[in-house]
């Protein structure tokens, strides 16, 4: 589901990819309220389709997705858009997952429940946009 953003941030397509529908939708809605054009999906393949169709700037990807691993999705997103800023979330901490995520170039690794304001701060800084309150 794609949510519209404000004109000054509409070029910043932000994907939220999480098998937890409620958490994913809430995070996408948080970013929409803050002026981003956010899209939520629970499946990695849907995220890839959206990435091909739009100007992908950032993605928040959970480690565990319905149809592929979050690590595999991040690698493929970076093939589509090498400059994409990726944050990864996880329901429980496993050092090997964080190490692997950092090796494939993620910007930030957060444990759930992740603070939406903190996630927004990381995304805004990466994109060079001013946070709105």
Predicted regions and their residues:
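Alpha4 helix (beta4-alpha4-beta5 surface) of REC/receiver domains from two-component response regulators
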Residues: 72, 92-109
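Acidic catalytic/metal-coordinating carboxylates
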Residues: 43, 69-72
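Charged docking surfaces used in two-component/phosphorelay signaling
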Residues: 25-33
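Non-catalytic signal-transmission and effector/linker regions of two-component phosphorelay proteins
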Residues: 1-19, 117-133
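Short amphipathic alpha-helix used as the core "switch/output" element in two-component signaling
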Residues: 49, 71-83
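Short hydrophobic/Thr-rich beta-strand motif most characteristic of the beta2 strand and flanking loop
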Residues: 35-43, 50
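The feature encodes the CheY-like receiver
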Residues: 66
């Amino acid at each position: 589901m794609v949510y519209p953003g404000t004109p000054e941030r509409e070029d910043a397509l932000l994907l939220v990819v999480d098998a937890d529908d409620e958490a994913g939708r809430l995070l996408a809605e948080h970013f929409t309220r803050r002026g981003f054009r956010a899209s939520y999906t629970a499946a990695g393949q849907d995220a890839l389709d959206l990435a091909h169709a739009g100007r992908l700037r950032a993605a928040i990807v959970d480690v565990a997705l319905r149809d592929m691993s979050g690590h595999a999705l991040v690698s493929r997103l970076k093939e589509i858009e090498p400059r994409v800023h990726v944050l990864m979330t996880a329901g429980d901490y496993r050092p090997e997952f964080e190490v692997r995520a950092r090796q494939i170039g993620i910007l930030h690794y957060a444990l759930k429940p992740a603070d939406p304001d903190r996630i927004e701060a990381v995304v805004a800084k990466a994109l060079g946009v001013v946070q709105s309150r």
